[in-house]
From Swiss-Prot:
CDD domains listed in its UniProt record: trmE (cd04164), TrmE_N (cd14858)
Annotated residues for binding of Mg(2+): 238, 259
Family of this protein: Belongs to the TRAFAC class TrmE-Era-EngA-EngB-Septin-like GTPase superfamily. TrmE GTPase family.
The gene coding this protein: mnmE
Subunit structure: Homodimer. Heterotetramer of two MnmE and two MnmG subunits.
Protein name, entry field: tRNA modification GTPase MnmE
Amino acids binding (6S)-5-formyl-5,6,7,8-tetrahydrofolate: 23, 87, 126, 458
Major location (coarse): cytoplasm
Organism field: Clostridium perfringens (strain 13 / Type A)
Length: 458
């Protein structure tokens, strides 16, 4: 069966480096690698003890040495895949690594599909689906905070929470089944059961909704905050970008319209991954290139989680500033009153009525810390706890929404005195939606799609 043949792939990033690892997993892993291994003093791998390493050489079909290696062996089920696993530590480098992999495949292994090692760990019951997805989140984490959140999920904290919710749903279904059986036996129904079912549904729905409430914060920790810097040309947007990056990334001149395109960078904002977008100024222009930049700026504003509006305090507000303010007023924003190190000329009732204003000098760095604090206040209530259970995955959030909607349906049925067996249909649907998060209830095609998004060797 394809799922349980022996697979192999490069587990480390392909490129020049000191060491690369080829991972081989399956019940013939040791036998296959042994065919192309020659140990020092003639030792092979068939007598290697689990969780030990052996030094030697990889050889080809002509018994010529390919590379100097150290081979480790993990006996299933105490391995990542829960299968016998061999890892070949060879020299890094594209040629050497691929040569070793090619010979492993010639010896009888199959090249692994993307995510197939993690998929086997899931299919073999070592981890559930949410833990498997956390593995990829650890790999792609952009900050220590996002990695810590992914580690929490990989250790099964979210899985435990979901399994507890599923148990509560099963308890509700058992209670309904008891009541329905009671009625079918022509016995007098217990009038307290619908009341108890309603109480339990309300409690379960509350817990599901509490998890949903963590999703926005969780998504920001996992994927990052999209933040757009917007304002008139030469207001100091590029200087702010450089101040946040601590390097000269954007061109800073006194010529209006210098930033003609959208500049994007990732920064680590006290553990929060932030995708920072420095836009071209928004203004009417006849310059074709600059006009394209202005349109891109508007697109980025519409996509952003947060808009940073920069105003120049060294001059009066003009019509162009007012147009920008009007464009972003219905979005989550912070107003930066820049160039406070210069003589102040800005005075406007429109500005006075704006929220979340911060005075700063992008040139000197004054006010940057206040900006960082304000961002955390707006999105994380001033503090971030990446170790608490939270929903970071859009797929999980959608499943929780479906569970909540079905529990709403169950509650409406109970309020309308519908038959309990009809109410149970909604509760069963909620149970299945929760099961999709851990993989307890999921179609095979969707499982394959999830793992296909993983990188090779993982």
């Amino acid at each position: 069966m394809k799922e349980f043949d022996t697979i192999a792939a490069i587990a480390t990033a392909l490129g020049e480096g000191g060491i690369a690892i080829i991972r081989v997993s399956g019940n013939k892993a040791l036998e296959i690698v042994n065919k192309i291994f020659r140990g020092i003093n003639g030792k092979d791998l068939l007598d290697i003890k689990p969780y030990t390493m052996r030094y030697g050489h990889m050889i080809d079909e002509n018994n010529e040495i390919i590379d100097e290696v150290i081979v480790s062996f993990m006996k299933g089920p105490r391995s990542f895949t829960a299968e016998d696993t061999v890892e070949i530590n060879c020299h890094g480098g594209i040629v050497a690594t691929n040569k070793v992999l090619q010979n492993v495949i010639k010896a009888g292994a199959r090249l692994a599909e993307p995510g197939e090692f993690t998929k086997r760990a899931f299919l073999n019951g070592r981890i559930d689906l949410s833990q498997a997805e956390a593995v990829m989140d650890i790999i792609t984490a952009k900050t220590e905070l996002s990695m810590k959140s992914a580690m929490t999920q990989s250790q099964g904290r979210l899985s435990t929470e979901i399994n507890n919710l599923r148990k509560e749903a099963l308890d509700i279904l058992a209670l309904i089944e008891y009541a329905v059986d009671f009625t079918e036996d022509d016995e007098e129904p217990d009038e307290t059961i619908p009341v108890k079912v309603k109480e339990d549904v309300i409690t379960l729905r509350g817990k599901v909704n509490n998890l949903i409430d963590t999703a926005d914060e969780g998504k920001l920790i996992r994927d990052g905050l999209s933040m757009v810097i917007v304002g008139k040309p030469n207001v100091g947007k590029s200087s702010l970008l450089n101040a946040l990056l601590n390097e000269k990334r954007a061109i800073v001149t006194d010529i209006a319209g210098t930033t003609r395109d959208v500049i994007e960078e990732y920064i680590n904002l006290d553990g929060i991954p932030v995708r920072l977008v420095d836009t071209a100024g928004i203004r009417e222009t006849e310059d074709v290139v600059e006009k394209i930049g202005v349109e891109k700026s508007k697109e980025k504003i519409n996509e952003a989680d947060l808009v940073i509006l920069m105003l120049d305090t060294s001059r009066e507000l003009d019509e162009e500033d007012k147009e920008i303010i009007d464009y972003i007023k219905d979005r989550k924003y912070i107003v930066l009153l820049n160039k406070v190190d210069l003589d102040r000329k800005l005075s406007s009732e429109i500005v006075d009525n704006l929220e979340n204003k911060i005075e700063l000098s992008a040139k000197t760095g004054f006010g940057i810390d206040d900006l960082k604090s304000k961002i955390k206040d707006l999105f994380f209530n001033g503090s971030i706890d990446a170790e608490s259970v939270m929903v970071t995955n859009t797929r999980h959030k959608e499943a929780l929404y479906r569970a909540s909607e079905n529990l709403d349906g169950a509650l409406n049925g109970l309020n309308n005195n519908e038959f309990l067996d009809l109410v149970s249909i909604y509760v069963t649907s909620a149970l299945r939606a929760l099961g999709e998060i851990t993989g307890a209830e999921l179609e095979e095609d969707l499982v394959n799609k999830i793992f296909a998004e993983f990188c090779c060797g993982k």
